[in-house]
Design a protein with these regions (language model features):
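Active-site pocket-lining/capping segments in soluble small-molecule metabolic enzymes
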Residues: 177, 181-215, 229
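N-terminal capping/lid subdomain adjacent to the active-site entrance of alpha/beta enzymes
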Residues: 1-69, 75-79, 87-90, 114, ...
Length: 252
């Protein structure tokens, strides 16, 4: 049985997005966004930081119109920046991801009260109690679930179920996984609560040659189709792993 079916997944075809870092120029950012849109990706996430925020997002909106666009701040701001976030409401972004410190949900709740754009928590969510607290105090309206951070499939499903029952959208984040980790992210993203495009992309976007076959590919519709083969659904290229290994340990 495929892993995604074993987990109770319902969406075999999952929508994909990409994350684009801070560039040397806005023109370079435009080029990267266009490349990803041409590749079929449905949602564009751009990193924002002081000095690379309002004007950049404004130019991206002007050039690309109503694409699905979000900003990821990686905790780069404080409550002193409320006015900035209020100004950026005009761009109708999908969300601001982790705008404030990862360990201060109360500040996020304060910010969310002052802006219209949904806040998405990422680094703040390590467990179901974290998600419960964030939702209860109004610290976010969206959650980014990272499988490795929350402790595996069981915990991820518990969190996604909790969020789904409270109409809090969830999406799958990425942590620069190889094909094996990516296969697990794909399986997780088929769960019912995962309703927004996640950071699950094609193997070739990060790897010259992945350690699984076939490589993960994105369709022209900007989706990934979960495999029907048993387990993670991909064959592990052990010869490739052996070639790349720096050190090995045998347990048991």
């Amino acid at each position: 049985m495929p892993l995604w079916k074993h987990l109770g997944g319902v969406n075999r075809e999952i929508a994909c997005g990409v994350s684009i870092g801070i560039q040397d120029s806005v023109e370079q950012l435009f080029d990267k966004i266009q490349t990803e849109l041409d590749a079929g990706y449905r949602r564009i996430k751009i990193k924002i930081a002081p000095g690379w925020d309002y004007d950049v997002v404004k130019q991206v909106r002007k050039k690309f119109g109503r694409i699905l666009l979000m900003g990821d701040a990686n905790s780069a701001y404080t409550l002193n920046d409320i006015d900035l976030f209020q100004k950026m409401d005009e761009f109708k972004l999908m969300m601001f991801e982790q705008p404030l410190a990862y360990d201060d949900m109360f500040d996020h709740a304060k910010l969310q009260q002052e802006i219209k754009t949904p806040i998405c928590l990422d680094e703040s969510i390590h467990s179901l109690p974290d998600a419960r607290k964030a939702i209860k105090i109004g610290a976010c309206k969206i959650i980014n679930l990272k499988l490795g951070r929350v402790g595996g499939h069981k915990q991820a499903k518990r969190i996604s179920n909790y969020c789904r029952q409270r109409d809090i959208p969830v999406w799958s984040g990425g942590m620069l996984e190889s094909g094996i980790g990516r296969a697990h992210n794909i399986a997780m993203a088929t769960l019912e609560g995962f309703t927004l495009p996640g950071d699950v992309s094609a193997s070739k976007r990060y790897w010259h040659e992945d350690i699984i076959e076939p490589a993960v590919e994105v369709t022209k519709k900007g989706t990934i189709v979960a495999p029907e083969k048993p387990g993670i659904g991909f064959a592990i290229k052990r010869d490739r792993i052996d070639k790349l290994a720096v050190k090995t340990s045998v347990i048991g």
